[in-house]
């Protein structure tokens, strides 16, 4: 099966371009002390910048910087602290030719990050925070709208679906419409089905199996499967750092069904897998 987003287009950031008709790797850069698989490894600006540059060399075309953990049960971080963690890293990386995404739900954080040189807003809460929709419209930057129910502290109790794929598409479509209604441009929207957020293992597998149905929404799709717990369960309880190959396999399955970007901790193995898949398409 070969599907790509129904509305492929190019995002342009000055002299940087992101062609969404081709699959890309978004490298994960957590500047948090408590992320589920790499918390505390990149707390210092120098370590974070070094890791970002390493991921670029490994094949990442976007670096996604997060200052708040959204693992199950994670506590909310104060806005000032999130800005303190994120902005210095953005300022330093902005000196390099790299597209920067900010993993935040706080309008104040994305505004500060954009002033520092960030390009994309990746919001796991789908612009539900106060003033988030208006901020997305005003900033006029690409925004990734993800499906989640509740908060990280409550989402594991909100995984009741009649049909997980149908329900995710319906709920995600409503959030996209809410964004359009306040003036967010359709060409600035990317969607993310939210693997691991308010979904159990079987629901995640079904959503991956039916990933192609998300293309019916007509927007570019981000697939964020890296080191997810359900992949560890499939791999007989593998620890997060042992899930690189399983994650890359799942990401390839989503690319085959229409994903144009995958969000990964293990950039090189993911980028290499995509290269092999792309070579196969050329035969």
Regions found by a protein language model. Give the residues of each.
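N-terminal glycine-rich anion-binding loops that anchor highly charged ligand groups
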Residues: 20-27, 54-65
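Active-site-adjacent loop and "lid" segments of alpha/beta metabolic enzymes
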Residues: 2-6, 14, 20, 37-46, ...
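N-terminal substrate-binding region of glycoside hydrolase catalytic domains
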Residues: 30
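Catalytic-pocket segment enriched in acidic/His residues
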Residues: 33
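Charged catalytic and DNA/RNA-contacting regions of genome-maintenance
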Residues: 11
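Short acidic capping loops at alpha-helix termini that bridge into adjacent secondary structure
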Residues: 185-188
């Amino acid at each position: 099966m070969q599907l790509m987003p129904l509305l492929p287009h190019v995002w342009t950031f000055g002299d940087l371009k992101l062609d969404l008709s081709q699959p890309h790797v978004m490298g994960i850069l957590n500047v948090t002390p408590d992320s589920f698989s790499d918390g505390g490894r990149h707390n210092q600006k120098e370590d974070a910048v070094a890791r970002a540059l390493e991921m670029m060399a490994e094949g990442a075309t976007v670096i996604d910087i997060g200052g708040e953990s959204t693992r199950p049960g994670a506590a909310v971080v104060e806005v000032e602290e999130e800005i303190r963690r994120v902005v210095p890293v953005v300022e330093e990386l902005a000196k390099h030719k790299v597209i920067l995404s900010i993993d935040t739900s706080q309008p104040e954080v994305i505004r500060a990050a954009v002033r520092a040189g960030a390009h994309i807003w990746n919001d796991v809460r789908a612009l539900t925070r106060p003033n988030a929709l208006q901020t997305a419209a005003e900033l006029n930057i690409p925004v990734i709208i993800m499906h989640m129910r509740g908060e990280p502290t409550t989402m594991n109790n909100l995984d009741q679906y009649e049909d997980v794929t149908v329900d995710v598409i319906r709920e995600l479509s409503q959030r996209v419409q809410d964004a359009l209604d306040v003036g967010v441009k359709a060409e600035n929207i990317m969607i993310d089905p939210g693997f691991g957020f308010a979904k159990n293992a079987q629901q995640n597998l079904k959503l991956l199996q039916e990933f192609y149905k998300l293309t019916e929404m007509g927007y570019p799709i981000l697939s964020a499967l890296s080191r997810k717990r359900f992949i560890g369960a499939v791999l007989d309880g593998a620890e997060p750092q042992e899930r690189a190959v399983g994650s890359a396999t799942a990401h390839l399955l989503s690319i085959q069904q229409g994903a144009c970007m995958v969000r990964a901790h293990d950039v090189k193995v993911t980028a290499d897998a995509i290269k092999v898949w792309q070579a196969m398409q050329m035969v």
